[in-house]
A protein has these predicted regions:
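Compositionally biased terminal segments of proteins
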Residues: 1-154
Length: 154
């Protein structure tokens, strides 16, 4: 796995960034391995968490970006370029999950240890809900493949 992605999770943990990994990386942990050009992060949108994110960004090597504390994160628009052409896409809301609090999603998140780092991924049920709401061709394919692997229509 790309070291910069590991560093994201490592420094998010170290700086107490409240986040959930969603998108393609979450799809992969539920069994459907596909390539993805970005790492999608759902961020709890509080002042304290944004300060923690800013501090983590410095350690990751993305720089000290003061505007992190006030900027609007727009899915697929507000992203940060990582090494090897990967992008870090940060969002503060997820289509299809508007009726769920961040805490509810965090409490139901799947935690996977990767290189001794606890990494938080959106739980399977809510991943499927978000994928259905996004309804892009790749999301439809993800749902089909995940359902085959997990033998259910969740």
């Amino acid at each position: 796995m790309n070291q910069q992605i590991l560093d994201i999770w490592k420094y998010f943990f170290q700086y107490n960034v409240r986040y959930i990994t969603i998108g393609g990386f979450a799809v992969n942990i539920y069994g459907y391995n596909r390539s993805t050009g970005d790492i999608d992060i759902y961020l709890e949108d509080t002042k304290e968490n944004r300060i923690n994110l800013r501090n983590a960004f410095v350690e990751i090597g993305l720089g000290d970006i003061e505007t992190i504390e006030t900027m609007q994160f727009i899915p697929d628009w507000t992203d940060f370029t990582l090494s090897y052409g990967l992008r870090l896409d940060i969002m503060t809301n997820v289509k299809g999950l508007e009726n769920k609090t961040f805490d509810d999603l965090l409490n139901s998140a799947t935690v996977v240890m990767i290189d001794e780092i606890p990494v938080k991924f959106i739980d399977y049920k809510n991943l499927i809900i978000a994928k259905k709401a996004a309804n892009r061709p790749k999301d439809i394919l993800d749902i089909e493949e995940l359902n085959k692997l997990n033998n259910s229509e969740k």
